[in-house]
Amino acid sequence: SSAASDVYKRQNNTIPGYTADIDNYFSKYREHKLISYIKKIREEQGIAYDAVPAATGCIEIKRGKVIIDPQCDASKISMIDSRWTEESFRTFVRLLNDFYRQTKFKDFYTLHRGLYDIAETRLNTILVDLNAEWFKSMFGEGPENTIVVASLCNGPGNYAFNGITKGEKRGIVIGCSTDKEGNPAYSRFLITVIVHELLHHYTNPCLAQYWSQIDSASQIIYPHVKEKMAKLAYGSTNSTMIEWFNNLLTIMYFKDNPNRGFTATHLTAWRQHEGFIWMERSMTFMEHFRNHRNLYSTIKDFMPEIVSFVNYTASDFDNVLKEYDNKAVSYTHLRAHE
């Protein structure tokens, strides 16, 4: 439950019949302690948006109970998302288990199995085009063990969740739109979102490892794009650079795996327009990686070069701004895909 929060409600993108079923089935449990606790940790700890799916990988249902995954070290939950504490997470899972049992949640789930099957089948038609081998060639491991969750009650919102250790689950949560029959539907453009979210599992650790070497340069870049980043809900230097790097690798995926309807050039222009105004430079720079794979077997091997690029870009940002301002590019056609 979103506990009366509109964080996960997107009025025009939910599945009306399913939303009504949720409200009708669970409304009599509004006073359950879980609901008041969710409100409490949302207000006091900011547990909302991606903090909720961030904890998903540490929860499982086993023998009719909601429990903390034995593979997950609850004492390190704050390493997955700093808004959680071990105490709040354990309390949340305990109350969630009680809610699960009191509401006979499995009965609700079984009643809607047909709807879930539609979502699963339709999402799989998008996933079938994913080139898992590309991930392996770029990072040394593929996404085969990544869980893809079809979410039917938070509109088009998409999230990624990571474990701390190799034994813990990692995955992505994919939202949906609806068709005229009120069933979950997915645009073929969603493949860009799926690739983007999957890449976070690889790019975030890479950037984190080298963050101390690009921190100062990132602090120089960020003020120039802060206003545009705020519109994208990237409210810090760190989140801005994480998204820049992840977007860069996403574009590289589509450069290597062309998709009808949107090209790497199109995606680069789109990201430039959003505020990552050094993206064209970034793609030009990455040709060095693509043309010298004999020297760089994976992106990890290339990270020192990425560090040098970020530092140089920061020192030359006046020219980056001039280049961007001088480009007379129309982005109107891009908006149809946003």
Positions of predicted regions on the chain:
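N-terminal accessory alpha/beta regions
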Residues: R10-E86
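Conserved small/polar residues in nucleotide/adenosyl-binding loops
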Residues: A3-Q11, Y331-E338
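Auxiliary, metal-adjacent structural segments of Zn-dependent hydrolase domains
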Residues: H112-G167
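Active-site recognition of the HExxH zinc-binding catalytic motif
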Residues: R188-A208
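Active-site scaffold of zinc-dependent metalloenzymes
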Residues: F161-Y186
